[in-house]
């Protein structure tokens, strides 16, 4: 499946301010940016600040500064999910009133034996919304989609996920609900992101279907992993992006995405590297794997 034409493509990058951008973030951002710009599409920026307790002070400003110093130019104003709570609440209440969602008072300890697959303990108990998580009822159906890099992906929502949380017990809205509503609101046609979100996609497809929303195309790029197999990330103290390393790290990110920048780009400026990337971007060259060890990258 190919990306949209230039007249209709709208992509996005949606970082979480729980820490600074690192090399793994750069790979995902670069893939989404080049996939949009290569066809003359728009590229939007969204700050996924749904979880204030986990937000690192100064992270939002640092993320914007890093993107700018690495040559990313977004269209329009950045939006913040923290400004969208009314929209999330309106849809959540509608789902609850229609019987498509319900309140759940299960504790983490109660759910430990079920290994992340919710068994429906509160499904028919009729709890009030107060001091409870809100879960979306899922059908006993298998959802499938064809990812532009990873190929066909299938997941049975009932057996492999169970009814999933759309608002946490502490009142914070869950990622699955927010991302679906924001992508639709912004008119996103193409989602390019890390392969760690591949298994979230069927839940999002179900929500889109339930709410009558259009479904974007998806492209999940391989995660960059450390020697122990963990992905690069804030949880593992991956070093933040620094401005002085922008040109070599952009070239390294291009190679991680299977692109083939020529040797004469060594020593080039950020603008020159980005221009080459936009002119030569080929999503078909992205490795069709879930991860790429950082140690393999030159």
From Swiss-Prot:
<dbReference type="GO" id="GO:0004818">
    <property type="term" value="F:glutamate-tRNA ligase activity"/>
</dbReference>
<comment type="function">
    <text>Catalyzes the tRNA-independent activation of glutamate in presence of ATP and the subsequent transfer of glutamate onto a tRNA(Asp). Glutamate is transferred on the 2-amino-5-(4,5-dihydroxy-2-cyclopenten-1-yl) moiety of the queuosine in the wobble position of the QUC anticodon.</text>
</comment>
<dbReference type="GO" id="GO:0006400">
    <property type="term" value="P:tRNA modification"/>
</dbReference>
<feature type="binding site">
    <location>
        <position position="106"/>
    </location>
    <ligand>
        <name>Zn(2+)</name>
    </ligand>
</feature>
<dbReference type="GO" id="GO:0005829">
    <property type="term" value="C:cytosol"/>
</dbReference>
<dbReference type="InterPro" id="IPR014729">
    <property type="entry name" value="Rossmann-like_a/b/a_fold"/>
</dbReference>
<feature type="binding site">
    <location>
        <position position="234"/>
    </location>
    <ligand>
        <name>ATP</name>
    </ligand>
</feature>
<dbReference type="InterPro" id="IPR022380">
    <property type="entry name" value="Glu-Q_tRNA(Asp)_Synthase"/>
</dbReference>
<keyword id="KW-0479">Metal-binding</keyword>
<feature type="binding site">
    <location>
        <position position="122"/>
    </location>
    <ligand>
        <name>Zn(2+)</name>
    </ligand>
</feature>
<protein>
    <recommendedName>
        <fullName>Glutamyl-Q tRNA(Asp) synthetase</fullName>
        <ecNumber>6.1.1.-</ecNumber>
    </recommendedName>
</protein>
<dbReference type="InterPro" id="IPR049940">
    <property type="entry name" value="GluQ/Sye"/>
</dbReference>
<dbReference type="GO" id="GO:0005524">
    <property type="term" value="F:ATP binding"/>
</dbReference>
<feature type="binding site">
    <location>
        <position position="48"/>
    </location>
    <ligand>
        <name>L-glutamate</name>
    </ligand>
</feature>
<feature type="binding site">
    <location>
        <position position="118"/>
    </location>
    <ligand>
        <name>Zn(2+)</name>
    </ligand>
</feature>
<keyword id="KW-0862">Zinc</keyword>
<dbReference type="InterPro" id="IPR000924">
    <property type="entry name" value="Glu/Gln-tRNA-synth"/>
</dbReference>
<feature type="binding site">
    <location>
        <position position="104"/>
    </location>
    <ligand>
        <name>Zn(2+)</name>
    </ligand>
</feature>
<feature type="binding site">
    <location>
        <position position="193"/>
    </location>
    <ligand>
        <name>L-glutamate</name>
    </ligand>
</feature>
<feature type="short sequence motif" description="'KMSKS' region">
    <location>
        <begin position="231"/>
        <end position="235"/>
    </location>
</feature>
<feature type="short sequence motif" description="'HIGH' region">
    <location>
        <begin position="15"/>
        <end position="25"/>
    </location>
</feature>
<keyword id="KW-0067">ATP-binding</keyword>
<dbReference type="InterPro" id="IPR020058">
    <property type="entry name" value="Glu/Gln-tRNA-synth_Ib_cat-dom"/>
</dbReference>
<keyword id="KW-0547">Nucleotide-binding</keyword>
<feature type="binding site">
    <location>
        <begin position="12"/>
        <end position="16"/>
    </location>
    <ligand>
        <name>L-glutamate</name>
    </ligand>
</feature>
<dbReference type="GO" id="GO:0008270">
    <property type="term" value="F:zinc ion binding"/>
</dbReference>
<dbReference type="GO" id="GO:0006424">
    <property type="term" value="P:glutamyl-tRNA aminoacylation"/>
</dbReference>
<dbReference type="Pfam" id="PF00749">
    <property type="entry name" value="tRNA-synt_1c"/>
</dbReference>
<feature type="binding site">
    <location>
        <position position="175"/>
    </location>
    <ligand>
        <name>L-glutamate</name>
    </ligand>
</feature>
<keyword id="KW-0436">Ligase</keyword>
<comment type="similarity">
    <text>Belongs to the class-I aminoacyl-tRNA synthetase family. GluQ subfamily.</text>
</comment>
<keyword id="KW-0030">Aminoacyl-tRNA synthetase</keyword>
